[in-house]
């Protein structure tokens, strides 16, 4: 996954976003590759954070082929950064718990703080449009205020990142539930998907 991550970072043509993403991953690369994406629910395993983020980056890259009006650099930057705050929010890949900062601040605010710090160290103008929209796609990726985002998506790329985040998380949760389910039976309730059960067909059609 490390090589794949490097390839995605290199693909970011916007020089501001490229330098900022490179700086943050220079600092957090090792943790990013080892951490889970969550304590429970989706991608809650060692390396799950990188697996989830890179899955979204791959989905975004393919989606731009269908919808060229989307800004690929913004989507890829957002995909790589959106959950990077998990390396501060969570204690680690083993016996994962929430840290004090994770409980009281949360990963969305934590990564936004890191983006601001990195931008200041790089002498970027935080009031420039390119910095504001990058922060926006990261801050808005949970989609709704009640789900933890301080703002709702107001850019097409922000809405797309939110939808891809939901899609990738949902598929991983369904896959995990169905792997433990006998053919011709329903899975246990999946908490992260409104406590719904999912059916595993008896045959592969």
Task: Tell where the protein language model's regions lie, with residue ranges.
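Divalent metal-dependent catalytic cores for phosphoryl transfer on phosphate-bearing substrates
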Residues: 51, 65-181
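N-terminal intrinsically disordered, cationic/polar leader segments
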Residues: 162, 186-191, 202-205
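Alpha-helix initiation and N-capping motif
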Residues: 2, 17-18, 131, 157, ...
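A structural signal for alpha-helix termini and helix-coil/disorder junctions
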Residues: 11, 27-31, 117, 121, ...
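Acidic/His-rich, divalent-metal-binding segments that scaffold phosphate/diphosphate chemistry
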Residues: 1-104, 128
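Amphipathic, Lys/Arg-enriched alpha-helical patches that create a basic surface
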Residues: 168, 198-199
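Residues that form generic nucleotide/phosphate-binding pockets
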Residues: 4-12, 23-24, 114, 137, ...
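Glycine-rich, flexible loop/turn motifs
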Residues: 28, 41, 189, 194-195
